[in-house]
């Protein structure tokens, strides 16, 4: 670990330094802390940096001056991550030109681009770091052995972000199980979950969410799709709702990677989930409230709410939906319709494949995986502009975040594009870390925590020494 110490002009209150889950407490990563930095590099505005062994695309979470994150260490070599969203398509096209049959093509693709369970032996860890110094307080191994399923090298074996209530940390890894630890690293309980096949061994990614005394997960896979609630005190399953969505024959897509959302609105509190081709909302006992067709076959962006509306990204080539509280039944739009009694508006061409949009200062900022950046009025759905961040912007998986009148877009090469908030597109600067990046950052008071493939950084604005 290396770190730099300097004097600061102010001290963040502990309450402002809580980041309890993926994309923050409100699932919309913004902050009003004016001390947060908008410039950084591997040497600039670095409070500390800590090497994190292994690999994981899970985000850091923060509570009571501690950072928690997961990683997986592989015995021997692990296949290097892939940038972009080509996946294996180009490779398949090359093999087809060689005249290979389908069976041989699939064998070569799996050998090059996937890690299968029999190929790797893994050790899964939960790390606890000190927020002020980056020092590792403790680490706990919570699973080991061959994984229950494989992964594409675009994914990791720990892409799910833990969640905390300030008393315990709840770690969910798809097809492995749920684990609970106290803040001193003592394991409180462990609940295995069944291992179900994911489409083409792409791996899992949907994080858990927490409300009251319950932990909620969604598992959209090829065999037994379900949403479930568990008692956070014991790990026992409280309810399970089977989901029959997506394609139903052969090996067609029934898997998804979307984190669910607890929507506390003026009518009720509900669990919003997005699966293949269909979004479904449940009450907190697992009863279906409403459903919406028209979602992509392989959804990834997460739903979230602000300003009284729920925003649901339908995926690449699909609409962005704004949904009113109190919906019931099938709220799917009719042919050619852009709104109905439950849907306030849709913007038909604004769905994206990977990053989740961010809502900031009355607008939605939508980032596509190839660097196309859009601003949409959050109340009306009117498109303000659509622009390319840069001719060489690269590829994006991380969701954008916002503060101090700026939107931040981190690409997979470690470059962050800083865009001015407002009705005109203006790229202010880029910040370069020169390290592969797939994890969404955390904002903890006046600290920005960014996880790259090898390192966790704490960025904090320097001030003059006293």
Where are these regions (language model features)?
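Sec-dependent signal peptide recognition
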Residues: 1-9
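Hydrophobic h-region of N-terminal signal peptides that target proteins for export
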Residues: 8-16
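Noncatalytic, solvent-exposed loop/strand surfaces
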Residues: 16-466
